[in-house]
Amino acid sequence: MAERANLVFHNKEIDGTAMKRLISRLIDHFGMGYTSHILDQIKTLGFHQATTTSISLGIEDLLTIPSKGWLVQDAEQQSFLLEKHYYYGAVHAVEKLRQSVEIWYATSEYLKQEMNSNFRITDPSNPVYLMSFSGARGNASQVHQLVGMRGLMADPQGQMIDLPIQSNLREGLSLTEYIISCYGARKGVVDTAVRTADAGYLTRRLVEVVQHIIVRRRDCGTIQGISVSPQNGMTEKLFVQTLIGRVLADDIYIGSRCIASRNQDIGIGLVNRFITAFRAQPFRAQPIYIRTPFTCRSTSWICQLCYGRSPTHGDLVELGEAVGIIAGQSIGEPGTQLTLRTFHTGGVFTGGTADLIRSPSNGKIQFNEDLVHPTRTRHGQPAFLCYIDLHVTIQSQDILHSVNIPLKSLILVQNDQYVESEQVIAEIRAGTSTLHFKEKVQKHIYSESDGEMHWSTDVYHAPEYQYGNLRRLPKTSHLWILSVSMCRSSIASFSLHKDQDQMNTYSFSVDGRYIFDFSMANDQVSHRLLDTFGKKDREILDYLTPDRIVSNGHWNCFYPSILQDNSDLLAKKRRNRFAVPLQYHQEQEKERISCLGISMEIPFMGVLRRNTIFAYFDDPRYRKDKRGSGIVKFRYRTLEEEYRTREEEYRTREEDSEDEYESPENKYRTREGEGEYEILEDEYRTLEDEYETLEDEYGILEDEYRTLEKDSEEEYGSLENKYRTREGEGEYEILEEDSEEEYGSSEDGSEKEYGTLEEDSEEDSEEDSEDEYGSPEEDSILKKEGFIEHRGTKEFSLKYQKEVDRFFFILQELHILPRSSSLKVLDNSIIGVDTQLTKNTRSRLGGLVRVKRKKSHTELKIFSGDIHFPEEADKILGGSLIPPEREKKDSKESKKRKNWVYVQRKKILKSKEKYFVSVRPAVSYEMDEGRNLATLFPQDLLQEEDNLQLRLVNFISHENSKLTQRIYHTNSQFVRTCLVVNWEQEVKEGARASLVEVRTNDLIRDFLRIELVKSTISYTRRRYDRTSVGLIPNNRLDRNNTNSFYSKAKIQSLSQHQEVIGTLLNRNKEYPSLMILLASNCSRIGLFKNSKYPNAVKESNPRIPIRDVFGLLGVIVPSISNFSSSYYLLTHNQILLKKYLFLDNLKQTFQVLQGLKYSLIDENQRISNFGSNIMLEPFHLNWHFLHHDSWEETLAIIHLGQFICENLCLFKSHIKKSGQIFIVNMDSFVLRAAKPYLATIGATVHGHYGKILYKGDRLVTFIYEKSRSSDITQGLPKVEQIFEARSIDSLSPNLERRIEDWNERIPRILGVPWGFLIGAELTIAQSRISLVNKIQKVYRSQGVQIHNRHIEIIIRQVTSKVRVSEDGMSNVFLPGELIGLLRAERAGRALDESIYYRAILLGITRASLNTQSFISEASFQETARVLAKAALRGRIDWLKGLKENVVLGGIIPVGTGFQKFVHRSPQDKNLYFEIKKKNLFASEMRDILFLHTELVSSDSDVTNNFYETSETPFTPIYTI
C-alpha cells in the first residue's frame, strides 16, 4: 500500500487523442504484448461502467439554449440594417452577402460555444452531452444542429444560401426552412455518395501505384539527404513530427562533439537534444540531414534506412514489409472516413470569422492617427488599417485601460470617440488562418426594376473593347437605375414633347397614332395634339408660337438626347459659356470674319444686365504664341499719365508642371499641375499683408479649385478643342466659365460696396480664351470682408474708357520655389536659356537672375535683355519705354534699334550708389479701331436693335505691368473685342438670354434666345417657365423671331395625371422611344416653406462657392441656363451628406457628435473637411456652419440632375425615396425615383449609359474572393488533383514554369551528361517537396495526421520518371519514352554517350500504367490494350510486385514469402564502399544540389500556398 500511495493520481477526462498518446507511451515503455493487456483491462472497465450506468436517450434530453432568442434577434437587426444600407447604395451586393454570412455564422458559432457551457452548468450528466462530448458518438456540430440552430446551408453547387435556418431540429423547421434544409441535406447525401466513391477510387489508385514497394534491403548506400531546420519557419511540433522515426543521413556535430552518427534512427531523446541545441545557438546550429524515401537509390523497392521506423511499433521497419500498400491505405482511408462525416452535418456551411477586440469599459478611445490608414472593410464599413502594432487607450472616468491591437487589424471606431463597454473596437484580420480555401467567384447583380441606367463621371464612357458594351470601373462609384415606363411612339416626326415636358397621363397609349390639326387663328397657330385613344378631353397640349407662319414642309422634332457617339461632345458643355455657331445665309458669309473666333457667353442663369458682355472675339493679331511669360505695359493716348515704376510682387501660380509641392502660394494649383488651369488673380497679392494665416481664411479655396481637376483628364486632356458639327459647317469652340451671378438688388448696397473691386479685377477676369478652360478665374477676394465671391456681371468702369494707344509685352520669368529648394544659380548672375535652376526646373529665358528669399518661399526672377553700367545713374529714367528711333545716349552702341526697349534701373546688392540698367526688348502691339459690329457679328442680332442695344468694346486682358505667367502649350491673348449690352438703365433692368438647340435634318443649330425681363432682378424675382420649344420647319428660319419661341405656361404641380416625358434616341432612327415617368415614380419635396426670403445670406458668409451646372447626366438640358434659381446657394461644392442619419440613432449619438470631425463625400468622391466648428442639431436636421460666432443657416444645395440617396437630411422633411432631381421649383423640387447600386473597382458594367434596362437584366458583375466551405468534400478533389498531376489552379503555375527553366538552363551551365542528371534531379526534388506540403495541408486542415513518409512514397513513384527528348537521338531509348531517372543515368554512364531527357510529372493513373509489370497494368485498366502491346513487344514480367503474384496465384514476396524471393548476396556488405569509390562526382554533385536548392527554397513561389489566395506564404517543411 505504501507504493500505491506514492503514485500520482490523475483525475481528468481522457478523449481520443489523449488515449492515443497514452497508448504510444505505453508501447515505448512496456512493449506491445504488455500494452495490449493493459488496454484489455481498460475495455472491460469501460463496458462494465456503461452497463451499470444504463444511460437512455430521449427527445427531452435535447435542451435548447436559453440565450438563443435574443442572439437571433440581434442578428436579425444587424441584417435589417444591412438591407437598408444596401438599399441606400452604401454597400454593394457582395459586401452585403459577405456580411450577412458572417453575421449568421458568428451567431451560430456563438450558440455552439454557449451550448457546451449550458450543458455543463445546467445538466452535466445529460446523455446527449455525455455522448457527444466524450467522443463516443456524434460531435459538437451535430448536437448543435439538434439544440442550437441549423444555420446557413449550402446549395448543391457549394454556394451559400443567404437565408439562414434559425430553428434547430428539436424545435422543428418552418416550411421555407425545411425546403432550404432539403437543399443542404441533398447536397450532403450527394456528397456522401459521390465523395465516398471518390475516396475509395483514390485509395485504389494509390495502392495500385505503390503496391510493389517492399522493404528489401537494409541500406541502399545513398549519400543524399534532405535538410530539416527550424530556422525555415517550422513550428516545433512540425519539426518533431518530421524528425521522429527518421534516419540520419549525416553525422550531427555540436561544436566539435558528434552527438549523433550517420544511419542512426532518431528517437524522442535525440530530438529533444536537437531542440535544446537549436535554442541555445539558433544561428550556429547546422541543418539536420535525414534520409527519406525520396533519397533511396533503388528503383522498385526501398531500403530500411530510407524508410525509417515502422509506424506501428517503434523499431526500424522489418525487411519484407509491404510499405507501399500501407502508404496507399493510410492516405486513402481518412478520405473515406471524412466523407462519411458529412452525412450527418450535410450541407451545413462553415466559414471563417475574424476575431474581434472589444472595449473593456465605457470611455473615450484614443490612438495615434498617423499610424493608421483609412480604408473600407470587406463589409463596406469605414475603418482604419494599422500599419504596425497599435497601442490604444480607453479613458473611463477613473481608470485608463490600454489595449494592444496587432498588425494589419482594422480599427472600427474613430479617434476620440466615446465607446461603450464590450463595444467592438477592432477586428483582427482572419488572414492568420490559411486553412480556408479561397476561390474567385463571379456574382451578377440584376436590376430590380425597369429603368434607365446612369452612372457618375467616374465610369469611363468608352467601352473596354471597341465593339463591346462592357466597362470596367476605374474606381468605386454608384450606378443608378432611374425608374421609367416605356412607350414606343409610332410616328417619329410627330412627337411634340420636348425632353422633360410634363403632360397628362392619357396622352400616350402604347400604339396611339397622333394626328395634327392645324387651325389658323389671328396669326397664332395652336397645334393641337390629338390622341385617337384618348379620353373625353381630346386636346392635351397647346403650343403657341407667336408671329410664325407655318409652312407645311417636313417637320422635325428635336430633343437633347444622349447619343452614343456624341456623348463626349455633350459632356463637354458643362457650364454656362457656350460657343455658338450662329447660322446665317451663304451670301453674307463673305462679308464677315468667320465666326470661329466669336464666343457667346451666357451669364449665369442667363440674366443680362446693363454692360454685360455676352459675346467676344479674340483677335489673332493680339496673341502671343511663343512660350514664356512677361509683363504688359500700356501707353495711353493721353501722355500725361505717369508710368508705373514700382516692381510689384504678384502672387502667381508656379508655371512648372514638374514642381509639385505644397506651399501657401501654391494653394491655387490643381493637383496634377496640368497646363490647363491657371489662376492668375491680381488680387491675391494682398493675402499675405492682410492675413498671416492663409490656411484658416482661405483653406476652402484649395478644395474648390481642386474640384475642377477631376474633369481635366477626360475633357481637356486633348488639345483638340475644336469640335466639328456633322456636316463640317464650321467649328465652334467649347468654352467654359464658372461664374455665379450675384443678384444684388439696388437697395442692397452691394454695388457700391465693392465698386473698387470691379475695376481692379476686370481685366483679369476676362483672361484669354485659350487657356482658361474651366478655371475659376472670376474669383476675386474682397479686401474688406475677406470672403470669396463670384461676380458674373462684368461691368466696365470708366477706367477702361481711356483709349490705350499701344501696349507692349516684355518677357520675364518668375519661379516661386519652396524655401527648402536648393538653387543652382546665384543671385544677380546672368544665365542662358534652359539653364537648370533647381533639381527639376529649367529657365526658359536667358538674362539676369534676381533671387528674393521670403519667409515661406523663394522667388526667383529672370529678366531678359542686356545689362549696362552707366556712369551717371541720375540721368536715367527708370521704367521708361524707349521707341525704336530714339537712341540711348549713354549706351556704347549708337545704331538704331528695330524694336522698342524697356529700361529698368536696378541697384546692386545693398550699396546705394552703384546702379545698373537692364535694357529689355519689348514687343509692341497697336490698337485697331477699325472693327465694327457688322463685320464681327451676324445680322440677326443687329436686327433686334429696338429692344437690345449692343456696343463694341476692345479691352486689354492684363493689368498694367502685371506679370502674366503662361503655360507652354497655350497662347496669350492680349486684346479681346467684346459685344456689350448697352441699354439705358431706366428702360430695362435686364434680359434673359438662353441658348436653344434645334436639330433639323441631323444638323445641330444653336440659337441665342434673349427674353426681356420686366421685373427687377432680386432675390424675390418670379420664375419664368422652362422653355418648351415648338416645331421648326426645315426649309429656312425667319430671322426676326429668334427670341420668340418659349412657352408662357407655368409648370403645374404634379397631380395624379401628370407625367414627365423624357425622349430617348434609339439606334433605330425611325421610331424614337419615349420614356414616360409616371407620377408614382416622382415625389415632390417642399423646400423652403417657412422662411420668407430663404436665401438672403449676409455678405459676411465666407463660403459661397463655385457653382457647377452639370447634372450627373453628362448632358446639359438646353434650358438650364435660364433657370432663375435664386435658391442655388450651395453649402459646399455639391456635397451630399452621405452619413446615415437615421432618426433613431441620432438622439443617442448627439453627445458624441460635438467632438467628431465630419468630412462629407459627394458623388464624385471629393472630400472636404469642415473642421470642428460644425454642430449637428439632431432635432431640426439642418446643417449649421458656425463662423466667428455668427449663426448663418445655409440650405443644402439642390441642383438639376443631382442624385439623392434616401433618408438624406437635406431639409426639415426626410427624403422618402432615393432619386434624381429633375424639376426644381421655387419652393419644391421633384424627384424621379431611382435605385442606387454601389459597384467597386474592377466590376464590369453591362450596357451603355442611358440604356433602358428591364427587370432582371444583368447590371454589374463583381469578381470577389470567397472562402470555400472547408469540409473534406471540398479538400479531397484537391488531393486527388495533386496526385493526378493535373492540378490546373492549385499547383502553382510557377512550379511548372520553374521545372521548364531548370530543365533548360542547368544542362547549359554544366554541360550535357551531368547537366541532364542534375537538372532532372533538382527539378524532381523541388517539386516533390512542394507536393508533399500541399497534400499535408489539406489533411491537417481536417485535423487528420498522416505521416509524411506515406505521402513521400507515393510522390516518389509519381515523380520518378523522365521523358527522353528528341534532341539527341540515342540508340537505346525511343524519343518520348518514359524511363526511370536512375535507369537513364546508368544507361548514359554505360554508353558513354549523352542521353537527352527532361523531368516529367506523371499522375497516379499514368504511373500505374507505366510500371515494369504488364500483369499489374492489365489488372488495373485497359486490359486488352496493355496485353496486346506487351505481346507485341515481347515484354517479360519478373513478378516482383504483390499484385502480379496474386493474379497468378503465387506466393507474394512479403513477410515470410520474402526470404524465398531474395537470395542475400555476400556483396551487400561491400556495396556501400563500392558506391563510394564509383561516385567520384558524388560529393561535388551534392554540393551543387545543396547550393541550388537553398536558392530555390528561399523563393516563396515554389512553396507558395496550396490555395493561391491565402495571405502568408507557406514555408517549406523541409528543403533538400
Curated annotation (Swiss-Prot):
A biological process (GO) annotation for this entry?
DNA-templated transcription
Ranges of biased composition (kind: Acidic residues)? 730-748, 756-779
Segments carrying the region annotation (Disordered) are: 645-676, 705-786
What Gene3D superfamilies would the database entry show? 1.10.132.30, 1.10.150.390, 1.10.1790.20, RNA polymerase Rpb1, domain 3
Q: Which cofactors does it use?
A: Zn(2+)
Note on cofactor: Binds 1 Zn(2+) ion per subunit.
Enumerate the residues binding Zn(2+).
Answer: 220, 296, 303, 306
Which Enzyme Commission number(s) are on file for it?
A: 2.7.7.6
The cross-references to SUPFAM superfamilies, in alphabetical order and at most eight, read:
beta and beta-prime subunits of DNA dependent RNA-polymerase
Record-level GO cellular component terms:
chloroplast; DNA-directed RNA polymerase complex; mitochondrion
Q: Note whether Secreted occurs among the keywords.
A: no
Q: Which InterPro entries match?
A: DNA-dir_RpoC2_beta_pp, RNA_pol_beta''_euk, RNA_pol_Rpb1_3_sf, RNA_pol_Rpb1_4, RNA_pol_Rpb1_5, Rpb1_funnel_sf
**First-listed, main subcellular location of the protein, grouped into a coarse class:** plastid
Describe the reaction catalysed, as an equation: RNA(n) + a ribonucleoside 5'-triphosphate = RNA(n+1) + diphosphate
Which UniProt keyword terms apply here?
Answer: Chloroplast, DNA-directed RNA polymerase, Metal-binding, Nucleotidyltransferase, Plastid, Transcription, Transferase, Zinc
What does the subunit comment say?
Answer: In plastids the minimal PEP RNA polymerase catalytic core is composed of four subunits: alpha, beta, beta', and beta''. When a (nuclear-encoded) sigma factor is associated with the core the holoenzyme is formed, which can initiate transcription.
Job description of the protein: DNA-dependent RNA polymerase catalyzes the transcription of DNA into RNA using the four ribonucleoside triphosphates as substrates.
**Entry protein name:** DNA-directed RNA polymerase subunit beta''
The organism of origin for this protein: Sorghum bicolor (Sorghum)
Q: What is the lineage of its organism?
A: Eukaryota, Viridiplantae, Streptophyta, Embryophyta, Tracheophyta
The coding gene here is rpoC2
